Amino acid sequence: CSKTFNATTGTPLSRLRDKERFEGYADCVRQGLSVRASAAKVGVTVDKAFRWRHRFLQSVVSQQPKGVAGMLEVDETYFRESQKGSRKLTRPARYRGGRAKGAGRKAADWVPVLVGRVRGQPYTVDKVLTRLNGAEVTAALKDAVKPGETVVCTDGHSAFLRLDKSLGVETRYFVAGYHGHTNKTFHVQTANNYHEQLKTWIQRGLRGVATKYLPNYLAWHRLMTWNKAGLTS
């Protein structure tokens, strides 16, 4: 092929300087340390620590559970579109987290995020979507489910209504307005609880993140839940 490669090609270590410090930095990411705390701990600049953060997290984005067995609760949530850190904005700036111009929730101002949580297990499926529709939901979940072993439980959104056919799995739907506010077996409370934890961490802990980095931060939160559950070393 007339090309050279080595063991680090295609990994976060490819063409990386100070490789001997990266393992220690990866441990800082697993612990959820800030950029400044991580930089001080491993002895690199704050700018390099930020670049390393996203170099590492990009490799975690695709590390999602596959062929899960059990109840997979699936629900969507939304994050306000953010151009944080951009030198040129494509829209008027918002100050102090103010509301976007225009009445109501314009689709262009919000980014849909799909979250699936395996009930009773520390496994999470997450995906930033361009639109919440059946095709994108199916693409996001197709590797996570296993026909005959996965039961998908969702709310009544139209994007979820044909998952039984598109994924070939058993589905259950829970609509609070129709079924009441509680159902001990079929519900999406585990997914909603994860939404709350995720939003609190991003909005309060990180003071918001740029939309272009949102997949990386979803992966980071997932990595920290693995670390808490003892699934990382």
Q: What residues fall within each predicted segment?
A:
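Residue-level recognition of single "structural anchor" positions
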Residues: 1-233
